[in-house]
Regions:
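Conserved helicase motor
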Residues: 1-12, 29-35, 136
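Conserved P-loop NTPase motor "coupling/switch" region that bridges the ATPase
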Residues: 3-4, 48-71, 107, 124-216
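Conserved nucleotide-binding/hydrolysis micro-motifs of P-loop NTPases
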Residues: 5-7, 31-34, 114-116, 164-168
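Conserved motor-coupling elements within RecA-like helicase/translocase cores
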Residues: 8-26
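Short aromatic-enriched loop/helix-cap "lid" or pocket-rim segments at secondary-structure transitions
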Residues: 11-14, 38-41, 120-123, 172
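Short basic/glycine-enriched coil/helix segment immediately N-terminal to the Walker B
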Residues: 15-21, 47, 94-106, 148-155
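Conserved helicase/translocase P-loop NTPase motor core
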Residues: 25-34, 71-106, 119, 127-130, ...
Length: 216
């Protein structure tokens, strides 16, 4: 696929060719891949699930008299998810393109998969290095597509390729598992980062040099 294929005037035609053609593989760039959306119904279902998880987390903190800071962080995340849902419900896409589900894709091979490490993360932890408070839209988009392919293939629909699966933090290992082994995490009640971290990790206090090497 070329950039021209994904210009607004050509995108629907190109996606239609994928959906109706008999191809062994279709190779496209990361930025173009993001332009093929999941259906609004599936996006809504996943956002509603995230909202439910956040609500449960907030209630759990209040029940156990958790720190106000942690509660506020989760409430901030909840507000952000609500805004996404409202935007989705009000959405009437002018660029009416074929959705990802309609393409007939049954496998994803993601090269340079480390570019998708900024996936949303909800946690009650504070002052722990490597826990990002931001998310990239392309990561959320890929996560939805991985979940969809898991349903089609029984958890064998996505392959990652990268030379740096973990570059800065063990949180990245958890993120990879969410992409590739989400159902396994759910089966073992490890889909929430705090449960995963308490099972496989240990929080320690230590002096650490900054990436620039100019301080601690």
């Amino acid at each position: 696929a070329t950039k021209r294929d994904f210009e607004t005037k050509n995108r629907k035609k190109f996606c239609g060719r994928i959906a109706t053609g008999d191809y062994d593989a279709v190779i496209i760039g990361h930025s173009q891949f993001e332009k093929i959306p999941m259906s609004i119904e599936r996006q809504r279902a996943i956002l509603e699930q995230q909202l439910e998880e956040l609500t449960d987390g907030i209630m759990d903190l209040k029940r156990n008299r958790g720190e106000n800071f942690s509660i506020k962080q989760l409430e901030k995340s909840k507000k952000s998810v609500k805004q996404k849902l409202e935007k989705l419900n009000d959405q009437s896409r002018k660029d009416d393109v074929v959705t990802f589900e309609e393409l007939g894709v049954d496998r994803l091979f993601i090269d340079e998969s480390h570019y998708y490490k900024n996936l949303y993360l909800y946690t009650k932890m504070r002052n722990v290095g490597g826990i990002a408070q931001t998310e990239a839209q392309k990561s959320s988009d890929l996560f939805m597509k991985c979940r969809y392919l898991d349903e089609l293939t029984g958890g064998r629909g996505t392959v990652f390729a990268t030379g740096t699966p973990i570059s800065n933090s063990m949180v990245e290992l958890y993120t990879i598992q969410r992409y590739l082994q989400y159902n396994t995490l759910v089966k073992n009640n490890l889909q929430h980062f705090d449960s995963w971290a308490s099972t496989f990790g240990e929080t320690v206090t230590a002096v650490e040099l900054t990436p620039e090497g100019t301080g601690y």
